[in-house]
Amino acid sequence: MNEAVDHAGLVAWAERHDAVLVFLQGVGDFVSAGTPLVEVHAADTPASGENELLGMIALGVERTIEQDVAFAIRIMVDIANKALSAAVNDPTTATQVLNHLSDTLHSLGRTRHLDGVTVLADARGQARVLMPAHRFEDLLSLAVTEIREYGARSIQVVRRLRALLEDLRQAVLPEYVGAVEAELARLEATVAESFGDRIDLDLAHVADRQGIGGPPRLHSRVLVREAERR
């Protein structure tokens, strides 16, 4: 398992050897024995330099959250999945997980260049390290897909998930809006399939930041009018 790498050390090593490092396995990827991990593009690399390079890559048996945001999301989603299992049936816990996922996704949604590759450059702006990285849509899908599937028949879950996505659509960078809208479309399809012939279909279509029982959403102009009337 590629657990972590020394970003600053890798850039310094590559600059010192006038090289470009291309990682074939990202942080969080399982690395099978004998699998190439990194390509070194340089005119000449001494053997001692290779040993130093390997010392900047942490391989182990478990993923870690320090450089692997997807694993942090995975842990939260697993908690929600267990809560939504037939044996537990605890949609409130799943809704609380969505609260924390919302916070994480809002932070990611304001982060530029979540486009599949991380480029680390030296002080002169020369690209020195290229690493596979998650796209925003990958992380969003990881955060919501399984909860949507396992919580498809829970009004509390689908309402909280709708609120999460609608809020996120307003907060993310323009280049990520399409990914959020795609997840909203998937949620619509899920609700139609799960609640199409049920009496609670209308409730399932309402966004609620608390899942069930939350206050209605108000816009600033509505608040001003209400204040003036009082």
Task: Pin down the residues of each PLM region.
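Short basic (Lys/Arg) and small-residue
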Residues: M1-A19, G26, T35-L37, H41-R230
